[in-house]
Amino acid sequence: MCIRDSKDIFVLVRTSNPSSSELQELELASGERVYEHVADLVEGWGAETIGANGYSRVGAVVGATHPEEGKALRARMPHTFFLVPGYGAQGGTAQGVAGMFDKDGMGALVNSSRGIIGAWKKSGKYSESMSADDALDLVAESAREAAKDMRDNLRAVLP
């Protein structure tokens, strides 16, 4: 499908939500966990689509809240691009996601939706008496600062 339709796809492998272990950590008859088996499938499915950058068109969703599994999955899926949710508000950290990148600091896209969108709540500057324009400015500035902090924290742990 990726080749035929010139599209990319991301497959849920090890997600960041707290209940993910109910399914993803189940042990199969082979002794593997479900997420490990899915990782092998993803790497195999993408084998025919590896481009000049060394990555396939079949990516994996690997949650920032599972840093040890993420590091092991990077070794298991060296040609797979990772989409990494769960950074920030869900507890994922720059140090924790560092192992999900390749040796050159590539191969992963880290997402922090709530941490950036909701940064204004942590600012302590919001007041119900603010004008709408001031509130929008606060939201924008807080989001900008949260994004910069995330960028700086990731840069500090990547090559």
Annotate the PLM regions.
Residues A39, E43, G70, A94, ...:
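Generic structural signal for well-ordered alpha-helices
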Residues A60, A64-N111, G115-K125:
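A C-terminal functional module that forms or caps the active site or interfaces directly
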